[in-house]
Amino acid sequence: MDKNTLIGFLLIGVVLFAFSWFNRPTPEQLEAQRRYQDSIAKIEYAQQLELQKQENKSALVEDSLENLPDSVRAQRLQQSFGVFGDAMVGTEDYTTLQNDVVELRISNKGGRICYARLKEYDTYNDEPLVLFDEKESNFNFTLVTATNRVVNTSDLYFTPVKGNDPNSVIMRLNTGEGSHLDFTYTLKPDDYMVQYQILGTGLNGVLAPSTNALDLLWEQDIRQQEKGRKFEDRYVTLNYKFMADDVEHLSESKSDSKQIPNRLKWIGYKDMFFSTVLISQEGFEATTLDSKAIPEGDVLKQFKTTASVPFDLQGKEATNLSFYFGPNKFALLKSFDKGVSAEQQLDLEKLVPLGWGIFRWVNQYFVIPLFDFLGKFIHNYGILILLMTIIVKIILFPLTYKSYMSSAKMRVLRPQVEEINAKYPGQDKAMERQKATMELYSRAGASPMSGCLPMLLQMPILIALFMFFPSAIELRHQSFLWAHDLSTYDAIFSWNKYIPIITPYFGNHISLFCLLMTITNIFYTKYNMEMTNTGQQQMPGMKAMMYMMPLMFLVFFNQYASGLTYYYFISTLITIVQTLIFRYTINEDKLLAKLEANKRKPMKKSGFMKRLEEAQRAQQETLRKQQEAKKKR
């Protein structure tokens, strides 16, 4: 890594810090948010107390009725839960709804989807890829009866009703003669989207007259599906979309919770490559989202949502929801918005973490189309990444060439810079030395900063690719050379023993592509520092920092996707080849002659150069005064 690259990274860091600093909330906003959270917490606490009372009451009823005769039990349940008493007793059974890509199991207890498997995918150890099962999920609506009893649908037994449509099933909760609550699930062929409709019939005297919404509780554990637990956990997030607005998410790195006062279009429980999304046409209101990080075990995070969904007590209109159980594949998620107005678009493709701002734009309109186009003809993704790297290098060639020419100019002027250093030795003549060097560069038509701008312009593509490769589900379970899966690390050596500091940050393995990337970066750094030595004095520690960066990348990327480290390895190799070609094809004698000719031409100073020289003169005067003050002492 050369000095220009390091400066580019530092500039990006400064921009990110400045953006965060100027967009931080004001004290007034923080105080308003605190008051809002306090009020929500009080309401939530009261609701939890009431819910706990109802749960305790239900548990006591079940315990006291367990040994009673069926007739007596039915009578007692009728007294405690009214028309819902009969639905409190039953035997759990399951109805399967499936197509070629998804298998779902719907339990008659709660009338909910309790199992979801993606047929076209497996886990990292070749087991069926199950998003969740009955023990890892909960989906419940709280019902308030006309007699002010609180009943949970998760405690009630529904009756499956099969209609004429083989792709649909109705889970019916009977509440009396001509009165029932229907949950209808419809799964079309080859579709990951499940239509979910809630419709009540004759519930006017069953539910409370004020009922115009149902309170939802949705919980799910996110399983580990990939080989690298720590790396996968970085991409496990609870996402949500505002109505006709942007997509946001809770913290990826720690437990998090948030109350959302605005209506939400959808809520998504996202793993690294797969998601479970609940969508509402009318929107979710009074939503509370909770994400709990699990440090060890097969579960990465536990997600929880409480929200309110509209419900028509008169039964004239159904509540229309949808589930998405499927992969985080950009083209697939984008297809759900085809032919849909901008206000109604789901924006599910934003579940794929492609970066923000210009980086996402580069991925969406350049990287992904190029990747998909090459994928139509090349099925070996190692070869595809190689060709993609070459294409990117060709596109960036003009910027790379300009950067190298700037370095070449600095290099051929090095003897003259060394003469200036000899003429103005010591720290006390630093300003004279700097001024003379800048005058030399200005007269010759060279600029130390001209090599930084091309490198900075390349950064959006380089960072976009850094975001793209770990998120590309196409690389999942795709092998190349010794790497069995390009979506995770390619360990050539591993161990089981926990080693303090090393295991948490480096892992219990060594990734070969990451190691090769580090070696090539160290070689390129050494070679490039020799080639770009301008004779000027470097900042203290700069050389050590240049060598430390590749070693830091070894630690940082060791647990990353091998597809990404393979790309960086190939990219650095191509850069080395380009540098060698530039080195031996550019005639430095002719270049020096051209620069000497520039020095003889009258040059009009730019406004920037004038301001730079004025600043240098001011610094020189300040330094002179400081030195005189020291002599007087």
From Swiss-Prot:
Q: Where in the cell is it found?
A: Cell inner membrane
Example of a GO biological process term: protein insertion into membrane
| Major place of residence | membrane
Stretches for region Disordered: 612-633
Quaternary organization: Interacts with the Sec translocase complex via SecD. Specifically interacts with transmembrane segments of nascent integral membrane proteins during membrane integration.
The Swiss-Prot or TrEMBL record describes its family as follows: Belongs to the OXA1/ALB3/YidC family. Type 1 subfamily.
The protein's name in its UniProt record:
Membrane protein insertase YidC
Protein's gene: yidC
